[in-house]
């Protein structure tokens, strides 16, 4: 018999909205934390201290565990590794080179290194999605929702985008603090252009969430500029590029030179302004 989830009160619904804005989690996962911890501060602390949300339905958990077991690495049975990830992608019809939904899964399912998945966060992450997903066909059917969320939800975009940086630099234990430029360009090209053309856009212009003013032409200038600089990409430049893209106007006039922007972005603004003066 299917379990019946009690509806959230108006107060709890507001707390769920606040929790999602802070953490970038799904509605289902946010609701689990709010129901368990009752107060926003306690729920957020638990989330960032990696305390688990309430367990999934036992039957769902068992089935998801069986999915994980199917792909785990025979030489390291505590992990799904690259070979298993490629098999998983094949079953889910994901092209890992061109489909950013794999990064959605990585962020939501707690992947700490590229192509690696521990069992507990893998199971809990899928269980946090709506619809009682307990099979690969159900997970595959949910992927279009994640793809749409990535290009339309600013908080989710930032969560997945920043997690991609951590993966690409080698995970949380890596001593590498920046990304090779070629890697960064590949990832920017994967994340930014699809969001430019979606309405609503994850890169909507602030403060009014109007259509983006930083679009493909400005993005192309950014790539051109970075290729000329030919430098590795720092975490600050990576993360703040999203805020910059959402705040800058089409003519690059409304830029706060005194703001706490990375020097790379300062230099880019001057680069674009010089180009515009020369037109």
UniProtKB/Swiss-Prot annotation:
Pfam families: Cullin_binding, UBA_4
Signal sequence, start to end: none
InterPro entries referenced in this protein's UniProt entry, alphabetically: DCN-prot, DCN1-like_PONY, PONY_dom
Record flagged with keyword Nucleus: no
GO biological process annotation, one example: protein neddylation
Protein function: May contribute to neddylation of cullin components of SCF-type E3 ubiquitin ligase complexes. Neddylation of cullins play an essential role in the regulation of SCF-type complexes activity.
Name assigned to this protein: Defective in cullin neddylation protein 1
Species of origin: Cryptococcus neoformans var. neoformans serotype D (strain B-3501A)
């Amino acid at each position: 018999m299917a379990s019946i989830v009690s509806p959230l009160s108006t107060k709890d619904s507001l707390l769920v909205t606040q929790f999602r804005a802070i953490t970038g989690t799904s509605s289902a996962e946010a609701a689990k934390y709010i129901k368990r911890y009752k107060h926003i501060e306690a729920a957020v602390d638990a989330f960032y201290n990696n305390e688990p949300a309430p367990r999934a339905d036992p039957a769902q958990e068992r089935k998801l565990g069986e999915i994980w077991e199917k792909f785990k690495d025979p030489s390291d049975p505590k992990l799904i590794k690259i070979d298993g990830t490629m098999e998983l992608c094949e079953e889910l019809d994901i092209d890992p080179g061109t489909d950013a939904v794999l990064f959605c899964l990585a962020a939501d399912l707690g992947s700490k290194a590229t192509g690696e998945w521990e069992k507990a966060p893998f199971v809990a992450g899928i269980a946090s999605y709506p619809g009682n997903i307990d099979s690969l066909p159900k997970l595959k059917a949910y992927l279009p929702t994640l793809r749409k969320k990535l290009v339309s939800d600013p908080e989710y975009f930032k969560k997945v985008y920043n997690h991609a940086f951590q993966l690409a630099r080698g995970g949380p234990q890596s001593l590498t603090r920046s990304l090779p430029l070629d890697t960064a360009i590949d990832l920017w090209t994967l994340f930014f252009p699809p969001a430019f053309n979606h309405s609503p856009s994850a890169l909507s212009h602030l403060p009014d969430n109007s259509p983006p003013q930083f679009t493909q032409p400005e993005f192309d200038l950014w790539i051109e500029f970075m290729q000329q600089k030919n430098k590795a990409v720092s975490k600050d430049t990576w993360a703040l590029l999203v805020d910059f893209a959402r705040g800058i106007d089409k003519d690059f006039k409304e830029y706060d030179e005194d703001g706490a922007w990375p020097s790379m972005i300062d230099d880019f603004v001057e680069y674009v302004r010089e180009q515009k003066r020369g037109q």
